[in-house]
UniProtKB/Swiss-Prot annotation:
Stretches for region Disordered: 232-264
Organism in which the protein naturally occurs: Rattus norvegicus (Rat)
Cross-link (Glycyl lysine isopeptide (Lys-Gly) (interchain with G-Cter in SUMO2)): 34, 249
Name under which the protein is recorded: Small ribosomal subunit protein eS1
Compositional bias (Basic and acidic residues): 242-255
A GO biological process held by the record: response to ethanol
GO cellular component: cytoplasm; cytosol; cytosolic ribosome; cytosolic small ribosomal subunit; nucleolus; nucleus; ribonucleoprotein complex; small ribosomal subunit
Length: 264
């Protein structure tokens, strides 16, 4: 038997020794998520990402992240049944600049509108905005009782349903086709499209609870940083007013950030 040290035993140390536990959060950084200038509250939250290591760049991990935010949080409002999807398109410093990616109604709102003794009318249409975004809009509306109606049901005839659906599609196409994405989002915030449909269909059959219930982003044009900065009120004068109001809040957030970095 050869005399000497058993290298395997000394190399590995004690068998079954505990590994040193590394806190995964020590390798991560917090980034602020910024909403476009269309919304009143710009600073919507923070997101976590692993720090840049070698070829793995932190900003690449952030781009394409989708955040779903209630409209009440974006507008500092009480009405909270609309949810907006915002997608990160660029990272500037510690800020993730987002753009509109979709809209939806909350499940409880949708369920509260569906009732007996009325007709539910749905329509959807694919439309392209003037700046090249292809959107799919879904609309929903419900028939209601006419004034002085005694009968408890208010069902529309199939012919009327088809007419109303045609009107819905016409109005949605018209409102989106003639505007860019920023103007479309400005219409979705108060849901002026739903109100227009309600007025237009009054002559066919009285409607209530008419909403654009969902907006899907199907296709986007090539990414341009200038346009994104304009959306965030960096290049346009119109966005400056809302940008300045929340500017103070953003500075406070940035002032709070450095101590965390020093500790890391």
């Amino acid at each position: 038997m050869a005399v000497g040290k058993n290298k395997r035993l000394t190399k590995g140390g004690k068998k079954g020794a505990k590994k040193k536990v590394v806190d995964p959060f020590s390798k991560k950084d917090w980034y602020d998520v910024k909403a476009p200038a269309m919304f009143n509250i710009r600073n919507i939250g923070k997101t976590l990402v692993t720090r840049t290591q070698g070829t793995k760049i932190a900003s690449d991990g952030l781009k394409g992240r989708v955040f779903e935010v209630s409209l009440a949080d974006l507008q500092n409002d009480e009405v909270a049944f609309r949810k907006f999807k915002l997608i990160t398109e660029d990272v500037q410093g510690k800020n993730c600049l987002t753009n509109f990616h979709g809209m939806d109604l909350t499940r409880d709102k949708m369920c509260s509108m569906v009732k007996k003794w009325q007709t539910m009318i749905e329509a959807h249409v694919d439309v392209k905005t003037t700046d090249g975004y292809l959107l799919r809009l879904f609309c929903v509306g419900f028939t209601k009782k006419r004034n002085n109606q005694i009968r408890k049901t208010s069902y529309a005839q199939h012919q009327q349903v088809r007419q109303i659906r045609k009107k819905m599609m016409e109005i949605m196409t018209r409102e989106v086709q003639t505007n860019d994405l920023k103007e479309v989002v400005n219409k979705l915030i108060p849901d002026s499209i739903g109100k227009d449909i309600e007025k237009a269909c009054q002559s066919i059959y009285p409607l209530h609870d008419v909403f654009v219930r969902k907006v899907k982003m199907l296709k986007k044009p090539k990414f341009e940083l200038g346009k994104l900065m304009e959306l965030h009120g960096e290049g346009g004068s119109s966005g400056k007013t809302t940008g300045d109001e929340t500017g103070a809040k953003v500075e406070r957030a940035d002032g709070y950030e450095p101590p965390v970095q020093e500790s890391v």
